[in-house]
Amino acid sequence: MQRDVTAHLELSVTEPADLVVAIAVSTHYQPSDEAFTALLDGAPVAATEFTDHSGTRFQRLQVGTGSLVIDYRAHIDGEGAQAPGVPYDLFSSRLPSRYVESDVLSPTAAAEFAGIEPGADLLAAVSSWVGTQLSYVPGASGPTDGAVETLLGRQGVCRDYAHLCAALLRARGVAARVAAVYAPGLAPMEFHAVTEAWIDDAWRVVDATALAPRQNLVRIATGRDAADTAFLTVLSGRTDLDVIEVTAVVDELARDDVTQLVSIR
């Protein structure tokens, strides 16, 4: 399997800014070709890369005012490494978080999934339920909406589906987290978000939107929710995102069998 991914961001920096982007593929991959560039009014800007314990790669940029253009590309041959079951992740992924209010949704999870033990059957049931209960409506949710708002509104985008799946799984005692990915086959193409749950001693991915085959996903960032996996975080100053373009292609697009357990590789 060969995959190519790219990301192009154009930002207007109206106040000197300190910002972090997470658009590079995670440390689970070893790209045979990869490049990250940042230009402020055409001049190169140095980026400082750091990683977290889950393999997410962040690039930090400190820039003055002007037009900032960020480009990333990577070519990946074969599969990436399997994500390990780090003890801290298995602990933190059981707890409520900013956008995954599993404690609030515990009664809902108990009522909807009563009698289904934690495992593959519960994972399939939650993903199917979320996929049928929600409508995919771009612009229907805001950046501060969590799983509760999504359930009440019954609509959202990929991150909302991922948050609600994670919340219901955590409420039933399953470690669940959110992953930002490149998703070959996704239309319209953009950064995508999915849910991972610890099932049968491995992180298994579900995508309640069913918009792209799970077998071809490329991991970017992993965390409790979108607060950990956002592609752009402005620490100080002000920037406006003017343009975002994402591509993700694979030499052979998989046919996804939703009854099968799949891991992001």
Question: Which residue stretches match the model-derived regions?
Answer:
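Glycine-rich loops and low-complexity Gly/Arg-rich segments
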Residues: 32-36, 45-48, 62-64, 95-99, ...
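Secondary-structure boundary elements
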Residues: 13, 70, 76, 80, ...
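Hydrophobic/aromatic-rich core segments of domains that either
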Residues: 128, 160-240
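Short intrinsically disordered coil segments
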Residues: 24-26, 85-92, 209-213, 235-236
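Residue-level signal for pocket-adjacent positions within structured domains
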Residues: 45, 56, 90, 146, ...
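Intrinsically disordered, low-complexity N-terminal segments that are enriched in acidic
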Residues: 1-79
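Generic structural hydrophobic/aromatic packing signal, biased to beta-strands
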Residues: 21-23, 36-38, 72, 109, ...
